[in-house]
Amino acid sequence: MKTLTLIGAGTAAILLATGAMAQDREGWPASFTVGTASQGGTFFVYGSGWANLVAEELGLTGAGEVTGGPMQNMALVHNGDLAFGLTTLGPAAESIAGTNPIAPGLAMDNVCAMFPMYQTPFHMAALSSQGITTLSEIPDGTVIGFGPAGSSADTYFPLMLEALGVSYERRNGGWDDLGGQLQDGLIDAIGFAAGVPIPTVSQLEVQTEISVVGFTDEELAVVTENFPVAAYAVSADTYRSLDEDLSSVAMWNFAIANCDLPESFVYEATRIAMEDNARMMNVHSSAAESLPEHWDKNNVLMWHPGAARWFNENGGASIAADMIHGG
């Protein structure tokens, strides 16, 4: 009789736990997709890896999706075509203001912040034979690839070069494709904005001789005064082509969620990214900056209630109610 009582209690406990889980998962999708960018870029590696972690731990189907990058991710997440995405705060601010070129005039305000990822440095790669050592001295007519249309590189790097007085021919494409064009001599240089090390740059270093070009002090002064970026040093051990730290500028990247997603779902997806940095570092080394303490780098997006709850309860954050969607 005692045995039967114990079994009954255990069964009741299991039923209670199952009921609680079902209640907590109310409204959860059976599958989800993370908008990343082109293959060969850090967004694709980071977003796909994080999606796999979330899917595995929560028992869902999830994957990264190749997209045009931050601008398109803002549009896709806003419309609910994607649950999650990755963006850069500059393009995010433009999207909220209604100046996203994908949908001019549409304020993409149904996109919420989830967690800080890493900073995106801007730098250039060129064949060593081109002799390009500084951005300001790039010869007129140089053909430069800037990644997919609407990417952070495509949005800001051309404007930076114009501010530095550079005249160039513009090309767009995925990072892997542009890397192949550079090797084949179809373009002269690539202007990158992605978490380091950028897979395409690392691959180029193995296959040919390249120069990785940053910003001089004078160029830094011009760019930081005119664009929403801050000075950033790319460590010398990032690329084989560097003998010393590379002077650059950078913007912060954040993971984003559709604001209508259930609070408990976004809480769990945020927890998985933030509670074990070593696991995220296994996805991509840029996740070294994916730390809860960087929550305060977001001054653009409203926070998803689930993400805000995780940071306020576990990340030492103090996200105010007026910065939380629906708060």
Predicted regions and their residues:
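Bilobed "Venus flytrap"/periplasmic-binding protein-like clamshell domains
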Residues: 29-57, 61-62, 120-184, 278, ...
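N-terminal segment of the mature folded domain
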Residues: 78-114
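Ligand-binding clefts/hinges and TM-proximal coupling segments of bilobed small-molecule sensing domains
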Residues: 140-156, 227-299
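Bacterial N-terminal signal peptides that target proteins for export
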Residues: 1-8
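Bacterial N-terminal signal peptides
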Residues: 8-15
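Pocket-lining segment of extracytoplasmic ligand-binding domains
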Residues: 89-91, 98-102, 130, 166-261
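Sec/Tat signal peptide C-region and signal peptidase I cleavage site
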Residues: 18-22
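An extracytoplasmic/periplasmic, membrane-proximal ligand-sensing/linker region
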Residues: 29-30, 177, 184, 194-208, ...
